[in-house]
Design a protein with these regions (language model features):
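Short helix/loop capping segments that flank catalytic or ligand/cofactor-binding pockets
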Residues: 45-48, 150-153, 249-250, 257-260, ...
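Conserved nucleotide-binding/hydrolysis micro-motifs of P-loop NTPases
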Residues: 41-44, 72-76, 146-149, 293, ...
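Acidic, Mg2+-coordinating catalytic modules of nucleic-acid enzymes
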Residues: 380-407, 411-646
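The start of beta-strands in P-loop NTPase/AAA+ ATPase cores
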Residues: 138, 285-286, 404, 464
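Extended helical coiled-coil dimerization/tether regions that scaffold
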Residues: 136, 144, 148-289, 315-316, ...
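Switch/communication elements of ASCE P-loop NTPase nucleotide-binding domains
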Residues: 1, 233, 239-394, 425, ...
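Glycine-rich phosphate-binding loops of NTPases
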Residues: 3, 7-32, 36-168, 175-179, ...
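Short alpha-helical segments and helix-capping/turn motifs at coil-helix boundaries
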Residues: 15-23, 49-54, 115-129, 221-224, ...
Length: 646
C-alpha cells in the first residue's frame, strides 16, 4: 500500500468512504501500479537471452517492452468496498487501515508481461510461460541510506571486505590467491589440531571411559577446520594509515568512509553483474547509485564523479574477456557532481506542486531549442547554447536544483541581494509564505543578457525574476556630422529621453520605446511563453517577472546605483571614510545637493563591488534587532522579491 501514489490512495479511501462512485464497468480502467521497461536492440546485439520476449520479428520493430502490473479489476474493487463496510468497525472506520491490511486480497499477483509495441492486448505472460527475468535484466543499486557511521563499534568497511572475498570472480589471479590462502590454512589446521588435542585431553579421556566393549565408538579428536570464506567474516579490520601509524576505520571522516564504502560496494555489485565464468551475464545490466555526495565535501565529490566512469568501465570486463553492457544511473542533489558531469548525460526531474507528478527532461533536448531554420539566427542560438553549457557547468549548476531563480546584472546585486532578501523578510513578514532566505532560490549573474537564459527558464519551468536596468537614452544629432544620430545616456525623466538600450527588455517585451516601460504597471511585467509563436507575452499569472527602475520619491533612476543613492542619502552621510569606493569630491557634491543621484552614480563610483560590501559593513540594526535598518531597498527590487516570495 505504501507504494501506491497519492492520487490512487486518495481515490481508494474516498471510494470506501462513499465520497466517490466508480465509472460504469464498460468505462472502467483497472487501478494500481504499472511499470514499463523499454528495451531497444539492433542486429549487433546477442539476442539469445531475449529471444523469448521478442514480440515482433519485423526488422523495423526493434523494441522489447516488459510490463509489470499490480492492478484491481472492477468486480474486485466492488467486493473490496462491500467487505470494508462489513468490517469497518474493526478498523476504526478508517479506509486507510483496511487497505493497508487487506489490499493484497483484491489486487492479486503482480502480472509480468512482454507486450507488443503498438498493441498492448498482444502479450506474453512471463510467469505462465516460465520465462526467467534473471537472464534478461539484472538491476543492482547502492542506496542513499548507507550504513556508514564513525561509531567505535561500526565496522562497515571491514565487513565489506569479507563480502568482497565471498563474491570475488573466479579469475586466475583470484584463484591463485585463494589457493595460497587455503594452503596456509591447512598448515594452520595441523598446528591447531595438536593444540586442541592438549586443550580437550581431559574431557576426551572422560568420554573414552564410556566406550565399553567398543572403545573406538568414543575415541574422538578435536580437529581444526578453518573455512577460508568464513574466516574473513568478523576477522578482518580495515585500517587507514596516518603518518607511521594505523588507525581504525571509525577514526576516519564520514566522507572518506562513505567514498571507500561505495567503491567496495561497486566492486561487489559489479561482481554480481559479471557473474561467475560458468554463467552468462544478463542481457541488460543496470546499476543505480543514489546520492553519492553524502557526508562528502565538494572536492571529494569532484574526485568521485571524475573517476566513477573509469571505475565502472574497468569492472565491465571479465577474466574470460567478456565485456558486459552496463547502464549506470547516478541520482544527486549536488551541484558539484552536476558541474563535473557531461551536460548531455544529465536528466532533470521536477515534481509539480499542483499535480504531484514528476516530469523528467533530458538536458540534451535543450539543444534543439537553440536552433533555427534561419542560418544567421541559428549561428547566434548555437553560440548561446555553447555559452550556456559552459556557464552552467562551471558556475551555476545549482540552478538545476532551485525552485526559483533570480537573474541579476552583476557583482553589486549579487553581494547585496541576500541582505535585501533578509531585510524584506524582517520588515514585511508573511504568515502564508516561507521567508525568501528559507526558499530554494538560485541567484545567477547574467549582465544585461538574461535573454540567453530564456529557453532554459522555459525548459526548467521555475518561477524566475529578472532584475535589470532601464538604461534610458536620448537621440542627439552629431555636432560634426548632421546626418549622424548619437545615443546619449540620460535620466528617464529627461524630456528628450526616448528609448532603452537594454537588450533584455527589448527581447522580452518587444519594444525599445521608453514611455512603454515608464508607464508599465507592475502586474503587466509578468510573462509567459506563447506556444503559438514561441515568444514571451505579458500575462499577469506568468512565471517570469522582469523588473527595472521605477519612479520613487519623485526621482526616476536609470541604474541600480542611482536608485540606491536617491533613497539612502542619510547612509551616505557617514562620509568618505565609510565609503572609500566613492570619489570624495563627487560624494561631497551629492551630499551638499549640488548634483543629483544620476550624476553622482555616473561619476562618483570607483568600484561597484566594493560599494556593495561597504553598504553591508555600514549597516546597523534597529532597537528591535532588525538588521540593515539604516538603508532602504529600491522599490523595483522590493516589489520583485515580494512577488517571488509568494
Amino acid at each position: 500500500y505504501e507504494d501506491f501514489n497519492v492520487d490512487l490512495r486518495s481515490f481508494l479511501e474516498a471510494y470506501l468512504d462513499g465520497n466517490l462512485e466508480l465509472l460504469p464497468e464498460e468505462s472502467f480502467v483497472p487501478l494500481g501500479i504499472r511499470l514499463k521497461l523499454y528495451i531497444k536492440y539492433d542486429l549487433n546485439d546477442d539476442l539469445s537471452q531475449v529471444s523469448q520476449v521478442i514480440m515482433n520479428l519485423d526488422p523495423a520493430d526493434d523494441n522489447i517492452i516488459l510490463s509489470f502490473e499490480y492492478l484491481v479489476e472492477y468486480n474486485e474493487l466492488s467486493q473490496l468496498k462491500a467487505d470494508y463496510l462489513d468490517a469497518a468497525d474493526k478498523f476504526e472506520n478508517k479506509p486507510k487501515l483496511y487497505l493497508k491490511d487487506k489490499h493484497g486480497d483484491y489486487f492479486g499477483r503482480i502480472l509480468k508481461k512482454s507486450i507488443l509495441f503498438d498493441d498492448e492486448s498482444q502479450f506474453i505472460d512471463l510467469q505462465k510461460e516460465r520465462i526467467n527475468l534473471k537472464d534478461i535484466v539484472s538491476i543492482q543499486f547502492i542506496s542513499a541510506k548507507r550504513s556508514v557511521t564513525n561509531k567505535q563499534n561500526d565496522k562497515t568497511l571491514s565487513n565489506q571486505t569479507s563480502t568482497l572475498y565471498k563474491q570475488a570472480d573466479e579469475s586466475e589471479e583470484q584463484i591463485e590467491a585463494s589457493d595460497e590462502f587455503k594452503k596456509e590454512l591447512r598448515k594452520t589446521d595441523e598446528v591447531l589440531g595438536g593444540i586442541y588435542q592438549k586443550m580437550f585431553d581431559g574431557v576426551i579421556q572422560k568420554v573414552n571411559k564410556f566406550g565399553g566393549l567398543s572403545p573406538s565408538e568414543t575415541d574422538i579428536r578435536v580437529a581444526s577446520t578453518l573455512q577460508h570464506r568464513e574466516l574473513l567474516e568478523g576477522n578482518t579490520t580495515v585500517m587507514y594509515a596516518h603518518r607511521d601509524h594505523e588507525l581504525p576505520e571509525h577514526y576516519n571522516g564520514l566522507g572518506y568512509m562513505n567514498l571507500i564504502s561505495m567503491i567496495f560496494e561497486i566492486e561487489m555489485l559489479m561482481s554480481r553483474l559479471r557473474r561467475s565464468l560458468s554463467e552468462k551475464p544478463a542481457a541488460v545490466n543496470v546499476l543505480f547509485i543514489e546520492e553519492p555526495e553524502a557526508h562528502t565535501h565538494p572536492q571529494m565529490q569532484y574526485v568521485f564523479i571524475n573517476n566513477i566512469k573509469e571505475l565502472l568501465k574497468e569492472n565491465q570486463k571479465r577474466e574470460d574477456g567478456l565485456f558486459i553492457e552496463l547502464q549506470s544511473i547516478i541520482t544527486t542533489h549536488s551541484s558539484h557532481i552536476v558541474a563535473e558531469s557531461d551536460f548531455d548525460d544529465i536528466k532533470f526531474l521536477k515534481k509539480c506542486s499542483v499535480s504531484h507528478r514528476v516530469v523528467a527532461k533530458n538536458l540534451k533536448e535543450l539543444a534543439s531549442r537553440y536552433q533555427s531554420q534561419d542560418a544567421k539566427e541559428d549561428e547566434i542560438l548555437r553560440s548561446r547554447y555553447k555559452f550556456l553549457k559552459q556557464y552552467l557547468t562551471l558556475n551555476r549548476a545549482e540552478l538545476f536544483f532551485a525552485d526559483k531563480a533570480i537573474f541579476i546584472e552583476g557583482d553589486t546585486e549579487r553581494i547585496v541581494l541576500p541582505a535585501m532578501m533578509k531585510k524584506i523578510d524582517m520588515e514585511d513578514p508573511s504568515q502564508k509564505e516561507l521567508p525568501l532566505l528559507s526558499q530554494n532560490i538560485s541567484i545567477v549573474e547574467v549582465g544585461a543578457h538574461s535573454q540567453i537564459f530564456e529557453k532554459l527558464i522555459e525548459f526548467l519551468g521555475i518561477k524566475s525574476l529578472v532584475i535589470t536596468d532601464i538604461d534610458s537614452y536620448k537621440e542627439v544629432q552629431d555636432d560634426d556630422n548632421p546626418n549622424q544620430i548619437n545615443r546619449v545616456k540620460c535620466k528617464p525623466s529627461d524630456p528628450a529621453a526616448s528609448h532603452t538600450s537594454n537588450n533584455s527588455l527589448d527581447f522580452y517585451f518587444g519594444t525599445k520605446d521608453l514611455d512603454f516601460y515608464k508607464n508599465l504597471e507592475f502586474d503587466n511585467k509578468s510573462l509567459n511563453k506563447s506556444e503559438k509563436d514561441n515568444t514571451w507575452k505579458q500575462d499577469d499569472s506568468g512565471f517570469l517577472k522582469v523588473v527595472y527602475q521605477t519612479e520613487e520619491q519623485g526621482y526616476f533612476a536609470r541604474s541600480y546605483e542611482d536608485a540606491f543613492f536617491s533613497i539612502n542619502k542619510p547612509l551616505l552621510e557617514l562620509g568618505h571614510d565609510a565609503f572609500p569606493s566613492l570619489t570624495k569630491k563627487w560624494l561631497n557634491k551629492y551630499l551638499d545637493g549640488n548634483i543629483d543621484a544620476y550624476k553622482f552614480a555616473e561619476n562618483g563610483v570607483g568600484s561597484k563591488p566594493s560599494l556593495a560590501i561597504e553598504i553591508l559593513l555600514n549597516s546597523k540594526p534597529d532597537a528591535g534587532g532588525n538588521e540593515f535598518s539604516n538603508w532602504q531597498v529600491p522599490l523595483y527590487i522590493k516589489e520583485g522579491l515580494l512577488w517571488l516570495r509568494n
